[in-house]
UniProtKB/Swiss-Prot annotation:
It comes from Candida glabrata (strain ATCC 2001 / BCRC 20586 / JCM 3761 / NBRC 0622 / NRRL Y-65 / CBS 138) (Yeast). PROSITE patterns: DEAD_ATP_HELICASE (PS00039), HELICASE_ATP_BIND_1 (PS51192), HELICASE_CTER (PS51194), Q_MOTIF (PS51195). It is found in: Nucleus, Nucleolus. This is ATP-dependent RNA helicase ROK1. GO terms for biological process: endonucleolytic cleavage in 5'-ETS of tricistronic rRNA transcript (SSU-rRNA, 5.8S rRNA, LSU-rRNA); endonucleolytic cleavage in ITS1 to separate SSU-rRNA from 5.8S rRNA and LSU-rRNA from tricistronic rRNA transcript (SSU-rRNA, 5.8S rRNA, LSU-rRNA); endonucleolytic cleavage to generate mature 5'-end of SSU-rRNA from (SSU-rRNA, 5.8S rRNA, LSU-rRNA); snoRNA localization. It is an enzyme of class 3 (hydrolase). The lineage of its organism: Eukaryota, Fungi, Dikarya, Ascomycota, Saccharomycotina. InterPro entries: DDX52/Rok1_DEADc, DEAD/DEAH_box_helicase_dom, DEAD_box_RNA_helicase, Helicase_ATP-bd, Helicase_C-like, P-loop_NTPase, RNA-helicase_DEAD-box_CS, RNA_helicase_DEAD_Q_motif.
Amino acid sequence: MDIFRVLTRGASINKKANQKGKTVDYSTADTDNDKVDNKQVEKQLNRELDFFRNKKIVSKVETAKAKLEDSVEDSHQQDNNDDVTEVAYDVKITTKEQASALRKSYKGNITGEDIPLPIGSFEDLISRFSLDKRLLNNLIENHFTEPTPIQCEAIPLCLNGRDLLACAPTGSGKTLAFLIPLLQQIIEEKNFSGVKGLIISPTKELATQIFNECVKLSKRIYLDKKRPLQVAILSKSLGAKLRNKVISDKKYDLIISTPLRLIDVVKNEALDLSNVKHLIFDEADKLFDKTFIEQTDDILNSCTDPSMRKSMFSATIPSSVEETANSIMNDPVRVIIGHKEAANTNIEQKLIFCGNEEGKLIAIRQLVQQGEFKPPIIIFLESIARAKALYHELMYDRINVDVIHAERTAIQREKIIERFKTGELWCLICTDVLARGIDFKGVNLVINYDVPTTAQAYVHRIGRTGRGGRSGKAVTLYTKLDSVAIKPIINVMKQSGCEVEGWMNNISKITKREKEAIKKGKSHKERDQISTVPKVERLKRKKKQDMIRASKRRQLESNAIESAD
């Protein structure tokens, strides 16, 4: 927009008149042209002042929008009203035809009974659900101006009190999709004391991230004159305070926790979950697998309110999780954005054959030489021992790298994540502890040094890049041992619309026996050690270490015999 034009509008200079030496009365400038300019400038200002600018949906919705704008503009001209904030540019979904067109635009598949209409913009929440103004202001301050597809569907469903099973790609805004309705419902239930909302996350890092987002959205929201909306993450220190009655559990309205810590506090009768009205499982496929299912079941048994609303969110929803959801939910609605086993379409996916383990290190170094190793970068491995080994190899290559895994303390992990987020650290090596939910802004490259054991693990790993509409790249290194394990990866690549090479189309379908082997981690033999030292040299070193240990053992035995004599 030309700012100088705005500042000088209303002034018109007749150059020919000046050349003839005649004076010009600027007060009699061309009013018709000025009106046209003013009209164009006003329309531009209106659009720039509209915080809730909407995406292009389909021609029917756009036509309705254009008619609405024209009618509003005509009425403003007739009434000579200069209040630009009254001009509405939002797309309101009022019919099933509009809803169908919107869902078709983002490939949404919604199944269930009595499904409410989606929202076309955040302004829809004001007219349909009387969204709290303080919550709306917090959305604007944090630059959340346009709902993503999962938010368009999940928010009205939750605000209508429906149980929900939601699946959407990584980085698509699932956290906001359950936080907005949850906070709105807590505000509406301000007369009830105690914990009203509960969010369960499989890892502490993800729980912390959800807590930080929740704090931003609940800023300056008071349930009465002196009591702000209280959000807490159930840390070790908070658990101790609750057990020792230093703090009452009635203080908090919303608690975010990992399963085991929550169960520990509940079993000690330090936290009452009987009043919880909204229960949300983030990364539901992980929380309902064999690792967490018993803990999740204990949590469900502790939440005794029969009217409690339950929601499950994840980027991947296996059929087993769907069966569990249908058994514990009341008339749930199933929302799938895209394909439930597909990765984010903004991610360029690539497979690199390395022959053997030594070839993987060579491939990493080739990426560096070819300029494809562009930070920030995350490298995933299958075990802590292998993550440590790769860290030492890359550290000696003078790459700005660090490693994070379950053996690191909570403080160490937090510091490493903070360094990575601020750009101080370029490359982060980790296990699957960081594969889920953690939102790192602007990750350019994800490297699967070890092939993931399942398609779900692969989708979550590469989902650390390509978030928030940005593009990203994912590279998976594989060897002869991974000939079976890469089959699910190739299927994900096809479903995500990636270009695949000819041999990928000709690969045989994965058998039931191979699926079971992959799930049990038996799809390949034990991997070789990560090292650039030749195998012959490693065997020599091992033989030498064995000789030293044997010598020490003989020395101890002889000392024991002498002391006995």
